[in-house]
Amino acid sequence: MKKILLFILSCFFIISCTNKKDPFLITKNSIGQVSDTTMIKDLIQIFKNDSIRNDISGDSFTGKFNDITIFDKSGNALLEITPKEDLEYTSTIKLIRIIDPRYKTLKGINSSSSFKEINDKYNISNIQNSLRNIIVSVNSANLYFTIDKKELPSNLRYNSNLKIDKAQIPENAKINNLYLEWIN
């Protein structure tokens, strides 16, 4: 009887240890312990060992959240979080800018990846041309990446009306910013 009880407790312990969520994993609906249903007020508990800075411009009546920035213990920025609704602590999250390269997708993409890595591992759904960057979207993962136009050939840098194809983007072009967006 003791052996059976010991076996059951051992199984329970092993299962409970394997259910811990990777704090740096990016999925379509989560990043670490933050999910698309996480409320702004929950960030204090989730990042209790880190520092949280939220900037409110204006006064408490007209103020708006600019962003909520999460810093690690060393003062390095990890994430910038934009709520769906300003000044509403029960709001969920609209957008997360992923700063720290320790955050990675299941396919190994992080904020230090190159365009080749993105193109090899994801189906690119859209490329938008803006004034200073191109925006590479991967709708299947709720991700988009910005790449500085300085990474592009000179004939593509100065006209934001040009249609840019993925074949025109150098493989070694580095990601400028990595975003996880939850529209719904």
Which residues does each PLM region occupy?
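Bacterial Sec-dependent N-terminal signal peptides
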Residues: 1-24
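Short helix/turn-capping signatures at newly exposed starts of structured segments
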Residues: 17-122, 126-131, 140-141, 161-184
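Short, solvent-exposed loop/beta-turn-alpha elements that line the ligand-binding surface or hinge
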Residues: 154-157
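Short aromatic loop motif centered on NTY/YTY
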Residues: 129-151
